[in-house]
Curated annotation (Swiss-Prot):
It comes from Hordeum vulgare (Barley). Thionins are small plant proteins which are toxic to animal cells. They seem to exert their toxic effect at the level of the cell membrane. Their precise function is not known. It comes from the Eukaryota. The gene is THI1.5. Belongs to the plant thionin (TC 1.C.44) family. 4 C-C subfamily. It is found in: Secreted. InterPro entries: Thionin (IPR001010), Thionin-like_sf (IPR036391). One of its GO terms (cellular component) is extracellular region. This is Leaf-specific thionin. GO terms for molecular function: toxin activity. Its main location: secreted. PANTHER family: THIONIN-2.1-RELATED (PTHR33920:SF2).
Length: 137
């Protein structure tokens, strides 16, 4: 019976992650050459300027992908608010909301395996599909 519960838990985890993946939308981002350009762009947008106008005025580019070109490295205003931190918080949030709920259902060897699978699924989700092996594996 414990095997059925663990299988159900994994299926529920996969379904929830599938629903979340369906809701992810790609939005355009701005990349600037330096912090001055980033500050200029943010001030322009705050004042009500459109993305293309502010990007042109401040020497920035509007991109549709997740990565800025090498010559336009400034994606965020603060250096500590970069993509690695966002990925880390995404993974922590996913594990907390999805995997911890599974952990509360049942304990045992199967559940430990399921938790590893759930953690890996969260890591893949937050890293755009990159495979990251679990520490417990």
């Amino acid at each position: 019976m414990a095997t059925n519960k663990s299988i159900k838990s994994v299926v529920i985890c996969v379904l929830i992650l599938g629903l979340v993946l369906e809701q992810v939308q790609v939005e355009a981002k701005s990349c600037c050459k330096n912090t001055t350009g980033r500050n200029c762009y943010n001030a322009c947008r705050f004042a009500g300027g459109s993305r293309p106008v502010c990007a042109t005025a401040c020497g920035c580019k509007i991109i549709s992908g997740p990565t800025c070109p090498r010559d336009y490295p400034k994606l965020n205003l603060l250096p500590e608010s970069g993509e690695p931190n966002a990925t880390e918080y995404c993974t922590i949030g996913c594990r907390t909301s999805v995997c911890d709920n599974m952990d509360n259902v049942s304990r045992g060897q199967e559940m430990k395996f399921d938790m590893g699978l759930c953690s890996n699924a969260c890591a893949r989700f937050c890293n755009d599909g990159e495979v990251i092996q679990s520490v417990e594996a």
